Regions:
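Thiamine diphosphate
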Residues: 1-148
């Protein structure tokens, strides 16, 4: 009988599988390297196994998403890890005015293989500034999709 996995373990396993399959996949975010592995341990073990493709960043959501967008523009697959969904607004300029428009600026010839991943919602005791769900903000462009 298979044991029930926590969502964090499932996401971590999925990321490990993606990194094994795609040598052009990069991950950028705050505190995501080992031994910490991110606020929710989703990235645990990735920086040890793939040290050339997993990068911790300064606390600047705008810079994280901007750098990730630049890597994606160069043809790479990129995951930008934002610690909490509430902080997504700080990087929204890069999403709205760079990442989503780039596909149109190149007449559809360029792909932006960019995922901005962030946990949303509460129930963890981090307080009101890290508990909001920001799904409606990602429906501003036809090239931007939100899943949860």
């Amino acid at each position: 009988m298979a044991r029930n996995k926590r969502l964090a373990e499932s996401l971590n396993g999925a990321l490990h599988s993606l990194f094994e399959r795609h040598s052009d996949l990069y991950l950028l975010g705050e505190d995501i390297v080992d031994p910490y592995g991110g606020a929710f341990k989703i990235t645990k073990g990735l920086s040890t196994r793939f040290p050339d493709r997993v990068f911790t960043t300064p606390i600047s959501e705008n810079a994280i998403i901007g750098a990730a967008g630049g890597l994606a523009l160069c043809g790479n697959r990129v995951i930008a890890e934002i610690m909490f969904g509430d902080f997504l607004a700080l990087g929204f300029d890069q999403i709205l005015n760079f990442a989503t428009k780039t596909v149109s600026l190149y007449g559809g010839r360029k792909q932006m293989r960019l995922v901005v991943r962030c946990p949303v919602g509460g129930h963890r005791g981090y307080g009101p500034r890290t508990a909001r769900t920001c799904r409606s903000t990602s429906s501003v462009s036809r090239t931007c999709r939100c899943t949860s």
